[in-house]
């Protein structure tokens, strides 16, 4: 009997994000009203939902509590057809991590509460996994190393180094993964370079594929096996909330692993998905589906050759309608 297979696996903390938009700065003791509100899964759920919505068979390795926020987050995630929640633990008495996001017209503020969670472990003998994502700011779990030895492609990311040290020890550990996806500020600080292009090339000394995201300016990638530097622009959208856009980018890029596309097309789809996700509030719930991609490309006709992506999205959308 053939072993079960997953395209993507995401492990980490699932949050409940409470997003308030259009929040004026209050005076001390004053009450202000937001223009919009959204409750959405956040944290690692941003990546998991984004990958699943592109048709990748995606699993979430995490836990939520039996509190009201956890129950609501669980219900939202359970509505995603391609998202496998067999490894999402529902833990009695555990408070689901929560982040309140206050978005004004020019700035954002966050308030987070998170209790210590039990460590997660991918079971031996579990389904094979095409790709997974890890944080490089802590030691890789043994189960990640085990999956990589079995053929899983390991993507890595980092967060902002609030210490300001930007230790190059991170670079020396990049041989533990296959693809590194930082944003441009992170990449330039770790490599001590002046621009994203030089940062991508420098990262290519340590990892097979380095992808540096640049927000509204697109992305640049350096592929060590070919020595090629590939740059793609982003598309222009009316941005409402950038929460989770980086997560949507990396998950969408991971979802293209089995497409057989050139690197440039994979980056273009990932960038498009990230851009479309900022048009509405929240991270996970704003990740686009193929039908959203088709609708945008057809209506807006952005510059460049989108024929491959449009054909794929249209075919995926037809499949969704038939389910």
PLM feature spans:
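Conserved phosphate-binding/catalytic region of the ribokinase-like
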Residues: 1-8, 32, 196-323
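Glycine-rich phosphate/adenosyl-contacting loop at the front of the ribokinase-like
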Residues: 1-63, 68-71, 308-323
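Short beta-strand scaffold segments in enzyme catalytic cores
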Residues: 49, 98-102, 109, 218-222
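Hydrophobic anchor at the start of a short beta-strand
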Residues: 58, 85, 154, 210
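Active-site-proximal loop->helix
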Residues: 68-81, 101
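A glycine-rich helix N-cap at a beta->alpha junction
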Residues: 76-94
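Conserved phosphate-binding/catalytic loop of the ribokinase/pfkB sugar-kinase fold
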Residues: 92, 99-140
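Conserved phosphate/ATP/ADP-binding segment of small-molecule kinases
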Residues: 148-153, 160-231
């Amino acid at each position: 009997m053939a072993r079960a297979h997953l395209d993507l696996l995401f492990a980490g903390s699932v949050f409940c994000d409470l997003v308030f938009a259009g929040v004026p700065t209050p005076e001390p003791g004053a009450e202000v009203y937001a223009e919009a509100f959204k409750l959405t899964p956040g944290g690692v759920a941003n990546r998991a939902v984004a990958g699943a919505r592109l048709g990748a068979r995606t699993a979430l390795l995490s836990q939520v509590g039996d509190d009201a926020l956890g129950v609501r987050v669980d219900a939202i995630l359970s509505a995603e057809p391609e998202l496998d929640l067999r490894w999402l633990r529902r833990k009695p008495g555990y408070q689901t991590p929560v982040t309140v996001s206050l978005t004004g017209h020019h700035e954002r503020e966050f308030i987070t509460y998170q209790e210590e969670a039990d460590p997660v472990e991918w079971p031996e003998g579990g389904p094979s996994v095409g790709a997974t994502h890890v944080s490089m700011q802590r030691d890789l779990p043994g189960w990640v190393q085990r999956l990589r030895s079995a053929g899983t492609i390991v993507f890595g990311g980092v967060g902002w180094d609030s210490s300001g040290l930007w230790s190059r020890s991170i670079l020396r550990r990049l041989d533990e993964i296959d693809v590194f996806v930082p944003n441009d500020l992170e990449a330039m600080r770790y490599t001590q370079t002046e621009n994203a292009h030089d940062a991508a090339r420098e990262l290519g000394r340590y990892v097979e594929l380095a992808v540096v995201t640049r927000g509204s300016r697109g992305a640049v990638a350096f592929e060590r096996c070919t020595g090629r530097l590939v740059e793609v622009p982003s598309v222009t959208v009316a941005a409402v909330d950038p929460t989770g856009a980086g997560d949507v980018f990396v998950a969408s890029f991971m979802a293209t692993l089995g497409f057989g596309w050139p690197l440039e097309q994979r980056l273009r789809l990932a960038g498009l998905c990230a851009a479309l996700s900022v048009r509405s509030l929240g991270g996970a719930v704003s990740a686009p589906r193929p039908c959203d991609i088709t609708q945008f490309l057809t209506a807006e006709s952005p510059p460049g050759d989108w024929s491959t992506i449009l054909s794929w999205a249209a075919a995926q959308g037809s499949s969704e309608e038939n389910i």
